[in-house]
Amino acid sequence: MRNSLTIGTRASKLALVQTHMIRDALQAAHPGLTVAVERITTRGDIILDRPLNAIGDKGLFVVEIEEAMRAGRVDLAVHSAKDLPSTLPPDMTLAVCPRRADPRDALVAQPGMTLASLPHGARVGTSSLRRACQLRALRPDLTLLDLRGNVDTRLRKLREGQYDAIVLAAAGLKRLGLEEVITELLEPDVLIPAVGQGIIGVEARAGDDEVLRLLAPLDDPAARAAITAERAFLARIGGGCRVPVGALALLEGDELLLYGMIGALDGRMVRGMRSGSASDPAGLGSALAEELLDAGGQALLAG
């Protein structure tokens, strides 16, 4: 068994915090294992002057790290699972999903402010079509503005007055020790999260049995079932950065509850929930996707 690994990751503060969590878990599971970290700049990190949906939706924060794995520079990659495309290349696999953190979206605004109490016409920043669609449905009076950059940059823009509020993933804020800036946690019946939100996705080369064996102790069955259902939902719809799609799976005993939404940019959307056995999460995800497509989602996707 090898005694060293190199992790590839983006260079943002959040990406490094998540990478160090995986590094520490690996070293706890395998005393004596040396784990190095290589920072890699992705296309999504470079292009900051355009909305994500205007750049493209196939692995904006992933492709360059996968290339480093193919070249043998790194052995595995640590991602926010919500950044992964709906289908991975055949030579890559989602090797590990550790225990999920808070999957909810978070509103960051003036202290005490909630989504319902934001003033008429308030400027709300988000880079997500999924969030924008659901916010338009809830509060059509809001002025939704694109928001790019890392978490620190987004919070700085809010402090400077460029926005009245912004919406970010709660998990990222909590991992960065910034929970105190959250003014409201948005429950899934208000905003359905992104597929994989709150999960760290560890990607490795398919067939790299030695690396996969080292990673195996880090996998969490509940997180694995949830992301399998959510990604099956996303894959059936064909969604990416260009389509407002959200899903959240919750494990209750042997049953998996899956919430999903398909939307349009103007705030029209279809939402639904389906339950099924946790032993077939992919089947549950595909079934809910079919249900929502038939209920009007297909027409929304067609424009």
From Swiss-Prot:
One of its GO terms (cellular component) is cytoplasm. Pathway: Porphyrin-containing compound metabolism; protoporphyrin-IX biosynthesis; coproporphyrinogen-III from 5-aminolevulinate: step 2/4; Porphyrin-containing compound metabolism; chlorophyll biosynthesis. Disulfide bonds: none annotated. HAMAP family: Porphobil_deam (MF_00260). Belongs to the HMBS family. Tetrapolymerization of the monopyrrole PBG into the hydroxymethylbilane pre-uroporphyrinogen in several discrete steps. This is Porphobilinogen deaminase. It comes from Roseiflexus castenholzii (strain DSM 13941 / HLO8). The gene is hemC.
